[in-house]
Amino acid sequence: MNKATKDLLEFWEEQMRLSHTSSNYFFRKSPSHYHMMLLVMSAYKLNQNLSVEELKTRLFKTSRPKSALIINEACEKCFFFLEKTSKDQRKKYIKPSEAFIKEFNEYLKTLKNLSF
């Protein structure tokens, strides 16, 4: 087995070990969960505000009620939180928690270190 294949298998084995103790399990439940994570983290990394309504609209092939359920669950699990601005108290922005940012950055670092 070549090194790249071995590294990739070890990576996924480690991800499976973490799956019930981290956000891995939650964001891999469905493509919608994973897409939400990517949208929120992309907005965070680009220093952009992403409103809950924008997120619901951008989630591919996910109904608005289902999107709302996923968002609420992510907030309950402290992966994300909602923030209001002083300009418009009706508009809520979704932001990643510090703990999730750290976990996501570790995930990216591990992915970058895989040799292909």
Q: Where is each model-derived feature located?
A:
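Short alpha-helical segments that sit at the start of domains
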Residues: 8-39
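Short acidic, hydrophobic short linear motifs in intrinsically disordered regions
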Residues: 46-58
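Phosphate-/nucleic-acid-contacting segments
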Residues: 53, 60-64, 88-92
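Short helix-to-turn junction characteristic of helix-turn-helix DNA-binding domains
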Residues: 40-44
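Amphipathic alpha-helical dimerization/coiled-coil segments
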Residues: 19, 105-116
